[in-house]
Amino acid sequence: MAETFLFTSESVNEGHPDKLCDQISDAVLDACLEQDPESKVACETCTKTNLVMVFGEITTKANVDYEKIVRDTCRNIGFISNDVGLDADNCKVLVNIEQQSPDIAQGVHGHLTKRPEEIGAGDQGHMFGYATDETPELMPLSHVLATKLGARLTEVRKNGTCSWLRPDGKTQVTVEYYNDKGAMVPVRVHTVLISTQHDETVTNDEIAADLKEHVIKPVIPEKYLDEKTIFHLNPSGRFVIGGPHGDAGLTGRKIIIDTYGGWGAHGGGAFSGKDPTKVDRSGAYIVRQAAKSIVASELARRCIVQVSYAIGVPEPLSVFVDTYGTGKIPDKEILKIVKENFDFRPGMISINLDLKRGGNSRFLKTAAYGHFGREDPDFTWEVVKPLKWEKA
């Protein structure tokens, strides 16, 4: 058999302090967009023991109760007492929000006077989209499994299957792969790591048994597990203190978990708390759709797309495509197809992916368990676009 290699991806679940902050920032964005789709939002959140602070620049006609959003989001995650790491109803909430800088406003959207195709990028930057044919979601298996384990931890906590669970937790999966002429083929799961917050009464043996039975078994397909698979289940021994009590949290600290689990590449810009004029978010969404559509149309088995911007300029500065040698046609042809089928101007991304629509917890849903590879009609960038091109 071909030579194999190991690759690892991690995830954290919704009670992790950094992810709590992402969710609060996106809950604020949802509330603003729901009432005023033209809202300009750059909302950061930080948290530590008994404190949540929301700060940033927001220009909106929406009437938003920031403190209520903070408390509701914390409560829905399960932070209902100091024992679990934060008490949603009694913690201190600080709000320090100002309007968007008029300098940025005139340069980007001309104080709302520009037509959609004229709207400039909200900042400079470069974003990457990635897709691979190794899973039905066209996402890396290591990332998919780590993410699903985290989501399952939350599910069995909330439905009472494992009542000893507390909100905070982390997962990590190492997959053995072989490289099939540039495409990634998973062979087996090499290692599964879960560290989850738990209550005082449960024993380590109970934790390990429950995690295997109720979390790992339903998530990881049997064909990937064998007698050599290594399990590290709460390897530190105790994880009673968690959430913001255990560690400080900050929006935008989990950008690899939000994307491709270390595969592909990342331009460094976080997503949560940003409206669609911020290309960190909208640019990353459109290049995911481009890469996914290339792989779904079987033009390549694996694909990365990069786009870059200058502040105030609508047209991208560059678009790049690499299929890692898996393309059915040369990469320069695929690049042409990408440019012909996708409009990378921020105002047009907003329209084509319907990104100004808030409410329905739309962006809040993206803020835990990944922005990509999700089957949900609100994740419009996951829709495969039928590609049109001149076949030579």
UniProtKB/Swiss-Prot annotation:
Residue positions binding Mg(2+): 10
InterPro entries in the cross-refs: ADOMET_SYNTHASE_CS, S-AdoMet_synt_C, S-AdoMet_synt_central, S-AdoMet_synt_N, S-AdoMet_synthetase, S-AdoMet_synthetase_sfam
Binding residues for ATP: 16, 168-170, 236-239, 247, 253-254, 270, 274, 278
Family: Belongs to the AdoMet synthase family.
Induction or repression: By Tetranychus urticae-induced volatiles, T.urticae infestation, ethylene, jasmonic acid (JA), salicylic acid (SA), and wounding.
Subcellular location: Cytoplasm
Gene3D superfamilies: 3.30.300.10
Originating organism: Phaseolus lunatus
Keywords, sorted A to Z: ATP-binding, Cobalt, Cytoplasm, Magnesium, Metal-binding, Nucleotide-binding, One-carbon metabolism, Potassium, Transferase
Listed pathway(s): Amino-acid biosynthesis; S-adenosyl-L-methionine biosynthesis; S-adenosyl-L-methionine from L-methionine: step 1/1
Reaction it catalyzes: L-methionine + ATP + H2O = S-adenosyl-L-methionine + phosphate + diphosphate
Source taxonomy: Eukaryota, Viridiplantae, Streptophyta, Embryophyta, Tracheophyta
Protein residues bound to L-methionine: 57, 100, 247, 278
Entry cofactors: Mn(2+); Mg(2+); Co(2+); K(+)
Cofactor stoichiometry and binding remark: Binds 2 divalent ions per subunit. The metal ions interact primarily with the substrate. Can utilize magnesium, manganese or cobalt (in vitro). Binds 1 potassium ion per subunit. The potassium ion interacts primarily with the substrate.
UniProt-listed PROSITE patterns: ADOMET_SYNTHASE_1 (PS00376), ADOMET_SYNTHASE_2 (PS00377)
Assembly description: Homotetramer.
Pfam families: S-AdoMet_synt_C, S-AdoMet_synt_M, S-AdoMet_synt_N
GO CC annotation terms, alphabetical: cytoplasm
Main location (coarse class): cytoplasm
Listed name of the protein: S-adenosylmethionine synthase
